[in-house]
C-alpha cells in the first residue's frame, strides 16, 4: 500500500489517499492543541504515542466485536484505516464530573456519576464545537434519530469495555470523545482515535492525570504522562 497525496490535515493528524478507494493512510502529528487551537505546541514523540495507544485500544475493541475503521499499524506514527464518511458529531461519554461539565453544572471535579452521561457536540471549529441536543441534531440534519440511537448505544458499549480495560491497568476512565463514520454499505463504525488526547485518564488511587489536561493546565511533561498510559496498557514505552 502506497501513501499518495494529502487529502486533509487536522490539528493532530494528516490523512492521505492510497491506491485503494476503500482505504486511507493516517499520520499522527507531534502537535498539541488546546482551547480550540488557541494553545499550540510541538511535542516530540506525541504522534508515536497516540498512534501506539490507539492501535492497542482499537484492537481490544475489535476483539470483543466492535466494528472500527482500524486496519493495521504501518509505522510508529502511521495507520491504515477504512475510508468512511465522518458523522460531524463528537460523542462524549462521562463517568466522572470533570472539565466543562464541572463548570456547566457547578459540581466538584472528581464526583463519580451514578451512571454514564452521553453528550453530543457539533463538529464545527467556527462555532467552537457546541453541545447539541437530539432536537438540534435533527434541525442540523447531520444524523437521523436512528443513527443517533446507534451512536449512543455504541458509545455506552465502548465505555464499558474501556472502563474494564483501563481498570485492569489501575487507571480510571473519567470521560472520552468518540467519532464515528458511515461505510459505503451504510454501517456505522468507530473512527478517528482513542488516546490520551481524547480521554481523561486518572490514576485510580492518586488521581494523577495521564491525559491532555497535563498540557491544558501546565501540570507537567505530556509525553511522560502518555508514556505511562502506553506502559500500563502493555505497549512498548520509550522511557
Swiss-Prot record:
SUPFAM superfamilies for the chain: SAICAR synthase-like (SSF56104)
Family indicated by similarity: Belongs to the SAICAR synthetase family.
Domain of life: Bacteria
Signal peptide boundaries: none
Recorded metabolic or biological pathway in which this protein acts: Purine metabolism; IMP biosynthesis via de novo pathway; 5-amino-1-(5-phospho-D-ribosyl)imidazole-4-carboxamide from 5-amino-1-(5-phospho-D-ribosyl)imidazole-4-carboxylate: step 1/2
Name listed for the protein in its UniProt record: Phosphoribosylaminoimidazole-succinocarboxamide synthase
Disulfide bond annotation, renumbered to this chain: none
Pfam family, one: SAICAR_synt
EC number: 6.3.2.6
GO BP annotations, alphabetical order: 'de novo' IMP biosynthetic process; cobalamin biosynthetic process
Reactions it catalyzes: 5-amino-1-(5-phospho-D-ribosyl)imidazole-4-carboxylate + L-aspartate + ATP = (2S)-2-[5-amino-1-(5-phospho-beta-D-ribosyl)imidazole-4-carboxamido]succinate + ADP + phosphate + 2 H(+)
Amino acid at each position: 500500500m502506497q501513501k499518495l497525496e494529502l487529502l486533509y490535515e487536522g490539528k493532530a493528524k494528516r490523512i492521505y489517499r492510497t491506491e485503494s478507494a476503500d482505504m486511507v493512510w493516517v499520520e499522527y502529528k507531534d502537535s498539541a492543541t488546546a482551547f480550540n487551537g488557541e494553545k499550540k505546541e510541538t511535542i516530540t514523540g506525541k504522534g508515536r504515542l497516540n498512534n501506539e495507544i490507539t492501535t492497542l485500544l482499537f484492537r481490544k475493541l475489535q476483539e470483543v466485536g466492535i466494528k472500527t475503521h482500524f486496519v493495521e499499524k504501518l509505522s510508529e506514527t502511521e495507520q491504515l484505516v477504512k475510508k468512511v464518511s465522518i458523522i460531524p458529531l463528537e460523542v462524549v461519554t462521562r463517568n466522572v464530573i470533570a472539565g466543562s461539565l464541572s463548570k456547566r453544572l457547578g459540581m466538584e471535579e472528581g464526583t463519580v456519576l451514578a451512571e454514564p452521561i452521553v453528550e453530543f457536540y457539533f463538529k464545527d471549529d467556527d462555532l467552537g464545537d457546541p453541545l447539541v441536543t437530539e432536537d438540534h441534531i435533527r434541525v442540523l440534519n447531520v444524523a437521523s434519530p436512528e443513527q443517533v440511537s446507534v451512536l449512543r448505544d455504541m458509545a455506552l458499549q465502548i465505555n464499558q469495555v474501556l472502563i474494564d480495560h483501563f481498570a485492569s491497568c489501575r487507571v480510571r476512565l473519567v470521560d472520552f470523545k468518540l467519532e464515528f463514520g458511515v461505510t459505503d454499505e451504510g454501517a456505522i463504525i468507530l473512527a478517528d482515535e482513542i488516546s490520551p488526547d481524547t480521554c481523561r485518564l486518572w490514576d485510580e488511587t492518586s488521581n494523577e492525570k495521564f491525559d491532555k489536561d497535563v498540557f491544558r493546565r501546565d501540570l507537567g511533561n505530556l509525553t511522560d504522562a502518555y508514556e505511562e498510559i502506553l506502559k500500563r496498557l502493555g505497549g512498548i514505552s520509550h522511557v
